[in-house]
Amino acid sequence: MKLDVNKQYSGFVIRQAAYIDEIQSEAYVMEHTYSGARLLYLGNNDDNKVFSISFRTPPYDDTGVAHILEHSVLCGSRKYRLKEPFVELVKGSMNTFLNAMTYPDKTMYPVASRNAKDFQNLMDVYLDAVFYPLIYENPYTLRQEGWHYNIEAPTDALSYNGVVYNEMKGVFSSADALLDYEAMKALFPDTPYSFESGGHPDAIPELTQEAFEHFHTTYYSPENSFIYLYGDMEIETTLQYLNDEYLSGFKRTGAVNSEIPLQNAFARTQEVLGTYPVGADEATEDKTYHELHIVTGDARDVKTSMALRVLESVLLEGNSAPLRLALLQSGVAKDISGSYAGSYRQPIFSIKAAGSKPEQRDKFISIIYHTLQQLTINGIDRELLEAHLNYLEFKLREADFGAYPKGLIYGISVMDSWLYDGDPLAGLRYTEALQQLREGIKTRYYEQLIENYLLDNTHKVIVTLNPEQGKEEREQEVLAEKMAVLKASMDTETIAQNIELCSELHKRQAAADTAEALETIPLLERSDIRREVEVTETVLKQLGTNDILYVPAFTNKIAYLNWYFDLTGIDKDLLPYCYLLSDVLGKFNTDKYTYQELATASNKYTGGVSFQMHAYSAADDANDYTIKFTVQAKALTANLDKLFDILQAVALGSKIDDAKRLQEILDEVNTDWDSSFFSRGQTVACTRLASYFSTAARVNEQDQFSYYEFLKELSADFAGRAEDTLAKLRQLLGIFFESSKYLLAYSCEESERMLVLEQALNFAALLPQSAVAGKTPQFLEAPGENEGIMTPGKVQYVAAGGDFHKFGYQFHGAMKVLETILRYEYLWTKIRVQGGAYGATARFDRNGTMFFASYRDPKLKESLQAYYDMPSWLEKLELSERELTKYIIGTISGLDTPLTNSMRLEQAGVYHLKQVDTAMRQQMRSEIIDLTNADLQKLAPLIRDTLSEKYLCVVGSSQSIEANKNIFTKTQHI
């Protein structure tokens, strides 16, 4: 139904109403007059409903109070007096999204669900949490989620522990986080942005209970809130609920002052010099970062923000970006990247050089200014501007956000203006702004943007971070000395008090919630779950030795193609070069395009073209696999001829003969690995672990730590290996694109099905036959066993696992429920709550692979012991019918995530390659829904036997790995 402007509904007055064509939604901006709460409702027929409540939460120090509070309000509330209602919701709701996020100036609490009853339950738990948390009566919440003194006996060393404390230790292990921290302090010295809202590990222990409570009292009130609703719902009923249950209990006071002030511009560019940690023996040459940050305009100016986003993309993203090219060709750095951060009161335009030298800073700045000045004089390439505008429009209209609900992303994006008292609808109405930006191509609009915001603007900071050997170890020593001095200053009584507090915290963490408390969390019934597996309609046909898989869908005139070319029989010694070729494809000149022209054409005519390699194991056997080179592409069907022209140029016309160009690409990939290695820690640990016992995983691991090592070795002797490497890449190019054995999976509208297929087959007809397609794979040897991979980080990623098929066990749907139980009960309690890690996961695959892994974990051997103790815990596990139902619902929720067109196509293709049929999926779903305690307990010996081989891999701090080196077969520094 439609709501009328200026009319009141359950205390809400409609201030603005409009239909937003771009997202096909009726939009209503409202105000709750009694409490002062703001509300935006986007009404449409999307059953994936979204609710969010956000608060403006500007930090006033580095203690991370906003972040810790975000964790803590979800640890029990007035109605839901459990230790962690949030976790109970994760365990047992049908949510399609459930999380909370701390930003530099706001905190958001969003939920989403397709089930109306479940959606109401989620909304109520979250509202009760933010307005009535138990933090005022339970000081142990701050100790658990924020920080506490960790000491269990008088002779123990004193240390800090806490979930957020350890999370932020992990965050600040990366150079990127340190760059951002230094930049924000310098860019906004007089505003809340100068503080780290997530918390700095050095400052988190300064947060007191009083300051913690004061922050909640100050900012968590309806008049400082932004409520967002999206989707198909009874809006009048929802408004009445919000008013009656929550908002009517809070009278607007006018006392909340959370406005984000503007930072005055500087008279001149500010300079910051700092260091970041690398290993004690790690080389430091070419590892300096330089980053120029420029404050640009006002977040509420949607057109300018969109234009600056396009300009950043034009200047700095892709192989045709002129500023990026100028910097790379000057040799100032090995990799150049840019970003536009529009979710600040004053957005930030950034240009980063990675893999540089300290003395290159002035040259970095000089080239930026010279290049920008030349662009304002000579003009930006109009085709380049058009290409990036086309790509932006494609992404906006496609609105494919992967597993994230569309309504969630809209809710986050409206905050870019709404949070600063701007129009929340402005960013959703992009058509007019896009048209104005297209008109700007005909004028000097973009050149004037460069002049006004990038050249003449003095609100800038240049940050330089140099690598410092052994910095992490020295900081740990300083912290240990500080803690020793602190403990020495404590009298016996104070030490005893801290031991008692630590002991009491552990008791509370280990204690189970009462049945009465658990039953306050609303729960669906098993009967609410759809028993039948959701089946994607597909049409499979064979053309000779090739398979064609069509997935019908409404795609808004977009064609999606996933092309899997068979490489199974490839020489195993060539596998590292296969992954390298996947990285360099499209980045060399071709017989028709320069690599810059190719990048422009791709942006102009497609929604993206990507290349990757992967080994797909059969559903029930990790050692029966095929290797596929995959091309993923999408384009408007009107541009299909352009898409295949691009693919033909890459497949048949790539000139892989330029050693200098290969060196440039290698430098970029190497530098990216260096800067992101620690953030990839869990993936590195888990893929390396799986490679110890799975031949398919050994192939895929060639794209992880083995690839990192391969790149380093190749770069170290590039002059001696360049020609051989180029020759191997040319050889592989003739094998990658082949017509002997492939799977073409594609999706488009039925009316365009034959058009898409005809053009695809015309392209395939040009491709050569292959000598490796359809052959038996050459098995790789395991790269090692039980490795400790040492980084300059402060925390660990601890993985252990094995192959349960080896011991005669078969996959069962109960394993997927056990994943949920372990992630959010056993491992959550042992690894996160008691151990202080940010998180932990569990995985059981049909192919026999099983692993457990922790994330940003301050512990090492304790986490391994938790894995080894798991079977004994599981043998004694007796869940009530309600608890079983809860975990079943939570598991099904993960399986029933709504799929976008591209996700549905990929799923169909992978199921085909892995030989997963509907009957297998239905059997698993039935086993999940019909789960019993006995099914779970049967898995205890499976875990015990599989872990008995003691396969493990740890990525983390050198100190922790050195202290536990006896458990490793091999340790090494990155």
Predicted regions and their residues:
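C-terminal regions of mature proteins
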Residues: 2-3, 231, 388-544, 548-552, ...
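A structural supersecondary motif
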Residues: 94-96, 291-296, 316-355, 413, ...
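Acidic/histidine-enriched segments that form metal/cofactor-coordinating
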Residues: 2-7, 76-78, 85-214, 306-309, ...
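Non-catalytic accessory/assembly modules
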Residues: 2-5, 76, 131-134, 138-177, ...
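N-terminal cofactor/phosphate-binding cores enriched in small/glycine residues
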Residues: 28-115
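His/Glu-based metal-binding/catalytic segments typifying zinc-dependent metallopeptidases
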Residues: 40-45, 52-54, 165, 169-173, ...
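A generic structural motif
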Residues: 57-59, 113-117, 231-235, 296-300, ...
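Short, Gly/Pro- and small/polar-rich lid/capping loops
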Residues: 2-29, 529-539
